[in-house]
């Protein structure tokens, strides 16, 4: 489905499950992003403020696609005037989960962010949370996406997460 349908679905899902999406949960972090351009706090805010509303049992039912769509819906709500967004972006190295590229004519132009989500079931959580850094194969995967973007858009500053 296209991005509009994904947003409609996520909005419906949030209402159906009484997931609170008010601005107080998110706006302060997005304002800070405007000043420092650090994506990690946006991801942390998403996990704590959005996913943190779900009961633990839900996490065995949701998948990586849900994570991508709900993250897209939240980020695009606050940054759509600065970035264009792509979910499952095709490139020569594969399909990146989430990409956001600065819109020409804005201060964000040439800013490109690549995010690769890795979803693990509860039984693998302890092992994954004990890692101090990403697995090398995951790093190489994202670097491949970044290199592809740099080839297509050499003037872009590609940041990975």
Where are these regions (language model features)?
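Extended alpha-helical interface modules used as scaffolds for assembling large macromolecular complexes
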Residues: 1-120, 125-126, 135
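Nucleic-acid nuclease catalytic cores
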Residues: 131-161
